[in-house]
Amino acid sequence: MDKYIKLPKELNAIEGHLHIHSLFEKERQMTFIGGHEWYKNELNFRGINIAALPRNASNNMACALYKVANPDAYAHGCFYYPVSPLKEKIEGLDPLTQYNELMEIGFDGMKMLEGKPNLHKLIGRDLNNKYFDEFYTELEKDKTHLLFHVNDPDEFWDETKVCQEHKDRGWFYGDGTYTSYEGIYEQIDEIMEKHPTLCVNFAHFYFKSKRPQDLEKMFEKYPNMGVDITPGGEMYLSFDDNYDYYRSFFIKYSERIQLGTDSTFPDGGEACKWLLDRVYRYIATDDSFKGFNNRIHKGFNLPKEAKENIIYKNFERTVGTEPKKINKEALKRYIEKYKHLMSDDENAKIQQLCEKYL
């Protein structure tokens, strides 16, 4: 018997929140293409969505190349910042230009990590800065889906509550040099007031699991806004602590909630299986199981309609029932434009993949 639950194939499940952290894994002698294909097939997903990260210039290229290799895959593109903090607008690298390039290539949506406090500080531009205005306007007009990481758990601003592991990862924000927890939300409030029909999914339950009433108000106000249930484990502890309320919440707002795990390549294998097992059990079964912070959770065992909404229907409704096809010529132009911003090693690996897939 398998140690972890596998998704029933008839669910047509879509993994909405994956990443690529490197192009190649030495241990398994595997590229990210093989790694994510293993993940998709091993766990019985109908489709997966890879969200690019502004780590380096090659991340968008890798996501697009994965879509070429696996045309049933989705991908969300991201902005690349050649310098930080941004002192001025860089011609040809502004958000609107980059957005249009990514849409021409055939990305299915956009990913922004810019709301994570450490990256927010590094870039040096508030989320509601006029630098992004044209992009938000075009995004709203086009009804393009945005997967948006905004904030982190509130305890990351409190030195007495943030754990050492998170401090070591650079996730303590209470030294006075970072925008406050509430300050970041205020920036989003201004964006949403200005663009109320923006098709946006806030990752990690918008870090509002302690204040779900805030989400309820936003759901009533913004028709195309939702959240995903990608761990942070802290949200699942809040679900436990308010079990009956949250089970009703998930049923009532099942059309605003999407499945995701935040799994990455090359950190695959057992860790990915463990994450999906916990998330799926929580929404789809009434199992009691050990999960986040070694807490014993009890699953919500949501009704069929609510489960299907969360597991695949909401993604299809907001992103698309079928992925967009990659425009290979547009991708070649993008690689040519950005290749000088990559290391020699990245260039070599991307070139090898281009020779195989383009």
What do the PLM-derived regions correspond to, one by one?
Residues 183, 199-358:
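H/E-rich (His + Asp/Glu) clusters that bind or coordinate divalent metals
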Residues 59-67, 88-92, 96-99, 123, ...:
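Distinct, well-ordered alpha-helical segments
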Residues 60-171:
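Active-site gating/metal-coordination segments in enzymes
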Residues 1-68:
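An N-terminally biased module of ancient metal coordination in phosphate/nucleic-acid-related enzymes
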Residues 22-32, 51-61, 82-93, 118-127, ...:
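Acidic-and-aromatic substrate-binding clefts and catalytic sites of carbohydrate-active enzymes
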Residues 6-8, 37-44, 61-74, 97-107, ...:
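Acidic (Asp/Glu)-rich catalytic clusters
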Residues 12-23, 147-151, 202-206:
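Histidine-centered catalytic micro-motifs
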